[in-house]
Amino acid sequence: MQHVSSSQSSQRHVQWPGACPGAGEEQPACSQPSLPLTLPSPSHQLQQLMVRGGPAGGQNMNVDLQGVGPGLQGSPQVTLAPLPLPSPTSPGFQFSAQPRRFEHGSPSYIQVTSPLSQQVQTQSPTQPSPGPGQALQNVRAGAPGPGLGLCSSSPTGDFVDASVLVRQISLSPSSGGHFVFQDGSGLTQIAQGAQVQLQHPGTPITVRERRPSQPHTQSGGTIHHLGPQSPAAAGGAGLQPLASPSHITTANLPPQISSIIQGQLVQQQQVLQGPPLPRPLGFERTPGVLLPGAGGAAGFGMTSPPPPTSPSRTAVPPGLSSLPLTSVGNTGMKKVPKKLEEIPPASPEMAQMRKQCLDYHHQEMQALKEVFKEYLIELFFLQHFQGNMMDFLAFKERLYGPLQAYLRQNDLDIEEEEEEHFEVINDEVKVVARKHGQPGTPVAIATQLPPRTSAAFPAQQQPLQQIHMGTPVPGDVNSIKMEASKRQ
């Protein structure tokens, strides 16, 4: 039997549906559709209250719950007051019956969805309390202390149906006597951080609104921000991570809002994940961090391996590590020139084409040599004479001995000429004999010396020429070198 009394002293007796067949005189009262109260079996110790007809504006309504079940002790009273919400009795109000949804978010929490059009009265901090009103007592399994936690949180924090209130009742044994009411949709008009005391003969219950400072729709996270207790009772301790981090409950919302939530979640996952990487990234769940003014969402971090501190620690692919390292040292060695043999042409046409190609490349090479020679003359003029460029044309026309030696020294074909001259020197070996028939020292004499050698030893050419011409010399080659050094 339930007794419902309003402030206008109007009493209506409503009997439970299970007790209607037993009492014949109370059957007309059961058929009144004004205040149907439906509750599940008492073994659940959870009640769902659905009020279709609210009180008049500016009035409070007291509901006495008697004999509900072992979950409520005594006869507590619940005060329902009107809020600035669309009234269920208005013609524009549409109520959609939502099915009850029971989920296991964490081992110590039970989520109960009840379509309430009127919420539990939480008074504005600017209005005085009308007096000793409601008292919510021990709705916790088997513990004597008050441990009721009601949370109304929206997945997006902005969109929520006015007729849906998600209540999450904490069943943890640790309780601090706090009544935490989270609301991200603006259903409850309470200032930031404001506290409203609900008077009760027993332990006082504190109503506090916590608004999240940032949206909690993270990739891979969950929207059910459950904590073992309120931040004041927890003392800033880390919150337990939820058991199922891969889903977001949108079954209690209209399909339009749920599709918006899923679309935003997919976009955020794409932004956070980015393009597919060739190597896997390590995902780890960091312990819950309590943000100021937030509901304690479990952090979700994405860690990547730190950069190597030294080049030796850099990971080398196995294909590169097997390459031989000796090939780098072979590049510094001088390659032995190979003698190229001329391949006879297959036809006269091929011989003609080959000749034309050789002539063309020879002309290009001669043009490059002429340009290089011009640059060498200009460089010699600027380095040795340091003159004016106006005199450069006159300097280039006249023949200058050091300039010719400088050009021969920096000639592009000097290496080929040196090789040819050294071959000539090795071929010509002559024996110098003295007048008295004593054998002399064999000396290698060349008819033409390389330009570098002739420029480096200009004074030694005369003794060598005298030896070559057969003039008598009083000593051997060593004495000739000593005399040449004395003359210098």
From Swiss-Prot:
Residues 1-15, 31-43, 113-126, 226-245 have a biased composition (Low complexity). It comes from the Eukaryota. Residues 1-43, 66-100, 113-144, 201-250, 271-336 are annotated as: Disordered. PANTHER family: E1A-BINDING PROTEIN P400, E1A-BINDING PROTEIN P400-RELATED. This is Putative EP400-like protein. It comes from Homo sapiens.
